[in-house]
Regions:
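Short beta->alpha transition motifs characteristic of CBS
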Residues: 97-103, 175-176, 199, 215-222, ...
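Catalytic nucleophile loop of clan PA
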Residues: 83, 197-217
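Flexible, gly/ser-rich surface segments that form the specificity/activation loops bordering the active-site cleft
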Residues: 143-148, 152-188, 198, 220-228, ...
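C-terminal cap/linker of serine protease catalytic domains
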Residues: 42-50, 209, 213-258
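Bacterial N-terminal signal peptides
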Residues: 22-33
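A short, Trp-centered hydrophobic/proline-enriched beta-strand micro-motif
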Residues: 50-71
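Gly/Ser-enriched beta-turn/beta-hairpin loop segments
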Residues: 67-76, 123-130, 177-191, 223-227, ...
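Conserved active-site neighborhood of the chymotrypsin/trypsin-like protease fold
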Residues: 63-64, 79, 86-167, 241, ...
């Protein structure tokens, strides 16, 4: 509401031309507001088109696990997701995922957006931040990197392999930033979102409205079952960058092929 000290101007006589102008201005603002809302609400198709080929299904085989996910071979653990990642290349064989997806794996298979399958191996792991880097001969387009310093309420989408059904997209907003001490990992810096995230989505991409990576899907808050409650977390791009920098400094990661 405008300051009340100026409200007296509202009672002044209004000539007809000004009244007509005011009416048209009101209509114009309403129309542009609707278009703006539609633009923000309908970013999902463009976000998907810009990024989905950079997101893969990750099928880890865990010892002694007898409940495979949808379409997975016997002995396969609940599926996860991964993201083709590189600093300076358009095409890469490096895949980011959540460490808890692959930590126990005796074998890892990835499936790209075209349905091609290949073996991947663990290249480096940061258990404290729950980040792992896989390497595979099945290269793919490195996802474009965004900025995780998004205003609260910004539109974002999550792409991942929910319930092992294959990659899908869900959209929502940034609910909070810099969430820490949640209890998932030793070192945390999460983006909280209400975009639907379910088991199998871990390691998938949280993307902005332009389809650029802003976080790596990591966990959900739920009480009684693995059901999305709208309180979901992605590792921030800043924390991912810190993790990869430490991996490089320690010599475990990763020389990109020129």
């Amino acid at each position: 509401m405008l300051e009340t000290r100026n409200s007296r101007w509202c009672s002044a006589p209004v000539t007809r031309p000004i009244a007509r102008l005011a009416a048209w201005l009101t209509i114009w603002l309403a129309i542009t507001g609707i278009f703006a809302a539609v633009t923000h609400a309908n970013h999902g198709p463009a976000s998907w088109a810009a990024s989905h080929q950079s997101v893969v299904v990750v099928n880890p085989t865990w010892p002694g696990y007898s409940s495979p996910g949808h379409g997975a071979p016997a002995g396969t653990a609940p599926a996860g997701s991964g993201v083709y990642y590189a600093d300076h290349q358009a095409e890469t064989g490096y895949v980011l995922t959540a460490a808890h997806v692959v930590r126990r794996a005796t074998h890892i298979e990835i499936v790209n957006a075209a349905g091609a399958r290949a073996t991947a191996v663990i290249h480096a792991v940061d258990d404290r931040r729950d980040i792992a880097v896989l390497v595979t001969n099945l290269t793919g387009p490195a996802i474009q990197l965004g900025n995780d310093n998004l205003p609260i309420g910004s539109h974002v989408c999550a792409i991942g392999n929910s319930f092992g059904l294959g990659n899908s997209i869900s959209c929502g907003v940034v609910s909070a930033r810099n969430r820490q001490n949640i209890g998932f990992n030793d070192i945390e810096d999460f983006i909280q979102t209400d975009a639907a995230i379910n088991p199998g989505g871990s390691g998938g991409a949280l993307i902005d409205s332009d389809g650029r990576l802003v976080g790596l899907i990591n966990g959900i808050f739920t009480k009684d079952a693995d059901i999305d409650a709208g309180v979901n977390f992605a590792i921030s791009l800043s924390l991912i960058a810190d993790s990869l920098a430490q991996m490089r400094e320690s010599g475990v990661l990763f020389t990109e092929t020129k």
